[in-house]
Amino acid sequence: MHTLRGAPALSDFRLAKLLAQCRERVPSVSSIYAEFVHLIDAPAPLSEADLATLGRLLDYGPRVATGARIGSLLLVLPRPGTISPWSSKATDIVHNCGLGERVRRMERGTAFFIAGPDGQALQDAELERLKPVLHDRMTQAVVGRLEDAAILFAGHTPRPFTTVDVLGGGRAALVTANRELGLALADDEMDYLVARFTELKRNPTDVELMMFAQANSEHCRHKIFNASWTIDGKPQERSLFQAIKNTYVQHKEGVLGAYKDNAAVIEGFEVDRFFPSPESGEWGSVREPAHIMIKVETHNHPTAISPYPGAATGAGGEIRDEGATGRGARPKAGLTGFSVSHLRIPGFEQPWEQPYGKPDRIVSALDIMVDGPLGGAAFNNEFGRPNLTGYFRSYEVQVPTPGGVEVRGYHKPIMIAGGLGNIRASHVQKGRLQPGDKLIVLGGPAMLIGLGGGAASSMAQGASAADLDFASVQRDNAEMERRCQEVIDSCWALGDKNPIRSIHDVGAGGLSNAVPELAHDNDLGGRLELRAVPNAEPGMSPVEIWCNEAQERYVLGVAPEDLARFAALCERERAPFSVLGDATAEQTLKLGDTQFGNAPIDLPMDVLFGKPPRMHRDVTSRPVSFAPLTLDGSLALLAERVLSHPTVADKSFLITIGDRTVSGLSSRDQMVGPWQVPVADCAVTLSTVTSTTGEAMAMGERTPLALIDAAASARMAVGEALTNIAAARIGKLSDVKLSANWMAAAGSPGEDASLYAAVHAVGMELCPALGLTIPVGKDSMSMRTVWEEGGARKAVTSPVSLIISAFAPVLDVRKSLTPQLVDVADDTRLLFIDLARGKQRLGGSVVAHVHGQVGPESPDVEDPALLRGFFAAVQALSESGSLLAYHDRSDGGLWATLCEMAFAGRCGLDVDLAPLGGDVTAALFNEELGAVVQVRASDVARVREVLAQHGLSRDVHELGRPVTALQVRVRHGGDTLMAEDTLALRRTWSRVSYEMQKLRDNPICADQESAARSDASDPGLSPKLTFDPAQDVAAPFIAKGARPRVAVLREQGVNSQQEMAAAFTRAGFAAVDVHMSDILSGRVSLEGFKGVLACGGFSYGDVLGAGGGWAKSILFNPRARDAFAAFFARPDSFGLGVCNGCQMMSQLKDIIPGAEHFPRFVRNASEQYEARLSLVEVSKTPSLFYQGMEGSRMLIVTSHGEGRAEFPSVEDAARVNGLGLVTTRWVDNHGRVAESYPANPNGSPHGIAGLTTRDGRFTITMPHPERVHRSVQHSWRPREWGDDGPWMRMFRNARVWLG
């Protein structure tokens, strides 16, 4: 083993945070320093030349001063016996650089040097206390000496399976195994298994039992939703699932697939779908329907235990569900949601956040909201899927019950991951597998993670042993999932020649659930080989190999004659796959093990999928009554508390961490207006890169209401989703389809009956009355946390919780409505549309919660016809252009609605509550359904007329108008009730986000952003163009018919090729998909291309620094280096590197003529991924891309984590800044070069955002012009822009340069 020192692993502010955590455990710690250590496993000693090459390969990250290596050493390593995702990618890079025969494997550890007083070493007991804050025990281990790291490369002996002696020990033996293995088997299931194995005259193996437990867990089989019911002694006619399916029975139109696949499919529009030709690789359009898959998952249990990987794998699993729909599909855009208990932010604890405690086995609500959103966002970012909408609720309350005071809340959180994608019409239905078809696993290796996750998530939190809880959390590798998705995309692009007959994602239960499901769906069995499963941990037992939930895997069936084609696609994408065996006509599952010459599984399929007795729920309802609300304090104090409640407050800290523009198909994200305020009601995507049609999605949830009335809570969730999605231009209400995610603490007093009432209200009554279908959903029935503390038994039980996600095809993305108040200086009016017919019930509201109360009466949807008429009226008014702004009423009531509209429009309000009655508190803070619209004064009569035509004549109230003065004034007739400064209210509303950013990110950046929000003179994003974007300067050249070829270059993990190809295709080029494997293998030569376009993404998952692995696989591979050097030297060639491509090209400066001044790009100053709509100014340079654009200030997309330009010295940065080769600079909204955050999103000196070579042929840029080459791709833009975005000029300039 060789070791090479790496760079410091943590920045100063991260070290300071870690030091504080360490001192909480060991007060005598005086200092801590961390640096990376690289560990190289080589078959023979490496030469000096090899070590020098490795040294250059491993030179990555910011160049900062190293700290003192004093005190005690704790070396954190990947867990011995495992191969980390870092290792597999770094080893790939090393092998691609020509060291494959000399380096077997590389791993990376982190060396922590921790000192006591005077730099002394710590005691062993003290070091033990520090280990939990330094490592993740699921995936890492800690050693005390560098030489102990050799254990990483030691061989591990595989272990055999075990059996459970059912024949000798009977049921008692199975009861013991159930407890020890965490199988979560019910009594009737154990009886069933004893009977079946007695019939078979043999004992079950641990593999067979775990497989049965996973396949038949509540998580996988939804036993409660399929159960029969008796409530209060009265048998019920339907199961819960039958009530949901009733919506489909009543309204099938527009639904192409429901209930039987990984996602539902609904009808989309016929459009020009854009993807590379399977034959030529050239990107082009195919006219066909782009049907829409929709799916929403939960990942609650893992997120409670370990939030970052829990949320990350939640997002990853849902993405795989979409990709594995039908015969393969493409995910497009995501949504996310979190419900947690009190945040209790240190230094910002709120009066209503009374402490109650939590069990040690789960993390706090605060930790969930610090780490969980980062995990979900990071997975989406790296995979390459924009996350465009979501919700966040913080709720915990003590309530009186007949049995005493109970705590209701979300110690077991809700973590929602959902989204939509597109699928070809011919691939909506899965094909039938035939005997002899190959059963294949595609994706990463088996790892000992997530064992028993399906069973574990089916138990109440705390009902299983802590080690089993922790073992059931999976770990993520988004870059691997991206490679698999590229294979799936290549397969569906083949149309009728798609080699995939059927595909499932590998989720709960791992292969033990996915493989039998694939065979069983086709009435087949399978003969399989255990050792064919790719395995990163050779020491695992058969049960661990077969049942682990290692992520980023799919199982699929391929005909033998299509195997070679499928293998070639996998090889090109470097996506691992393995043939596990064959499908068989005999319906038996036989899993052989060549290692031990036995069969861990040999089971008739009907044992696994037989029908254990159907569950019956015999439950009683529990009547509740809550005292009338007593709301203390002035109206101004109530208003402040409501705005600062996390459920109402600014969600920026959850949004700017997530890429919202990757793929170039986002049209409406969360951020609204020139001040980019996160208040959008819904998300809107484009059907394809050239369309104005699209898809919308929105969410609705009103879970606190369920404490009062579960049925009303469910109806309100549907209602909120509809008032949100109404902001998109949708044909008719029945075009909207819903996903329903149901959470309940089944078995807790009264909760089962409440769940039944909620499902019945939506499935049997409201949705049929509205013409709505629920073709997809999920249930999680163990929403209770139990523990002991100080000898007392404690519990936190969630309310019955319905999260609705609404999806619909969109007729015209340009007509999406937002809450931004516009034309404030003109005569406009605010109309309030009240869908509660004057009722102002405050039960379950935020204003009740800030008083620690619930309230006796819940808002409700009492007249579905009113909601139907409202939706139709809003669509008619949207089509006619009569609505200037729109925002629904929800959490925080009318007060939050009005404030958010004022924040988005950066204006004041003059509001009169007199039309709403005399109870101003109820009028302002009730959360009944409704919406506020802004209309021109001259249009008020016509708008009222349209609303009246739809049955809303008595539900419209004129409340006042927006004003230019930055003051929100609330009156009741002539009495002023409140007059608050808009910016002061905005600071109150944004305080939670500021405090969370300060805790999580670089606090200096959080302070700078907070200060920027308070700038009263901020004009908002202010683009200024020196050219006409409507002028097509390339038209004369395109008219000649020549389409120069450009290579749209990608490496494994790159995800932004579609938008790059779209921009250059629109500019008259022939854009060709080129993978680095094509070049390294010699399949493709760069000689036939005029341009090389290096795309954005996460090549090699940013291992060895962003773009570093990609660059080094060129520099250190002779064939690739020669090819690129020759291309760069040609005078007729040009190149563009964007984001990851920019990071990569900057490291090729030694072989790019005139690029010696290129910097390297390192971690953003915020130490966070930054996704924003920014401003840059174009400078005068030789760059061929920017000719005629000089002096323009332009809107551009920022999406990167490592975009800070780093030069060898301050002097070097100043020198490069003066060379006339900086193409673009970040500027603030006043047009000044931006040095502070967030106008300068990464901290680059002199605002440097892009550079070019001395002759202008090669340009690099961190922000993404290709993602906003059309105006509809901007989250905000001036209304006068046409279809071409200003950045389209840049791509046309390249066509002009070629002539």
Curated annotation (Swiss-Prot):
The keyword Cytoplasm applies. GO terms for molecular function: ATP binding; metal ion binding; phosphoribosylformylglycinamidine synthase activity. The active site is at C1139, H1264, E1266. Mg(2+) binds at D681, E720, N724, D888. Its main location: cytoplasm. Keywords: ATP-binding, Cytoplasm, Glutamine amidotransferase, Ligase, Magnesium, Metal-binding, Nucleotide-binding, Purine biosynthesis. Its EC number is 6.3.5.3. It is found in: Cytoplasm. It comes from the Bacteria. InterPro entries: Class_I_gatase-like, FGAR-AT_N, FGAR-AT_PurM_N-like, PurL_large, PurL_linker, PurM-like_C_dom, PurM-like_C_sf, PurM-like_N_sf. It catalyses: N(2)-formyl-N(1)-(5-phospho-beta-D-ribosyl)glycinamide + L-glutamine + ATP + H2O = 2-formamido-N(1)-(5-O-phospho-beta-D-ribosyl)acetamidine + L-glutamate + ADP + phosphate + H(+). One of its GO terms (cellular component) is cytoplasm. It is an enzyme of class 6 (ligase). Pfam families: AIRS_C (PF02769), FGAR-AT_linker (PF18072), FGAR-AT_N (PF18076), FGAR-AT_PurM_N-like (PF22689), GATase_5 (PF13507). SUPFAM superfamilies: Class I glutamine amidotransferase-like (SSF52317), FGAM synthase PurL, linker domain (SSF109736), PurM C-terminal domain-like (SSF56042), PurM N-terminal domain-like (SSF55326), PurS-like (SSF82697). Phosphoribosylformylglycinamidine synthase involved in the purines biosynthetic pathway. Catalyzes the ATP-dependent conversion of formylglycinamide ribonucleotide (FGAR) and glutamine to yield formylglycinamidine ribonucleotide (FGAM) and glutamate. Monomer. In the N-terminal section; belongs to the FGAMS family. This is Phosphoribosylformylglycinamidine synthase. It comes from Myxococcus xanthus (strain DK1622). The gene is purL.
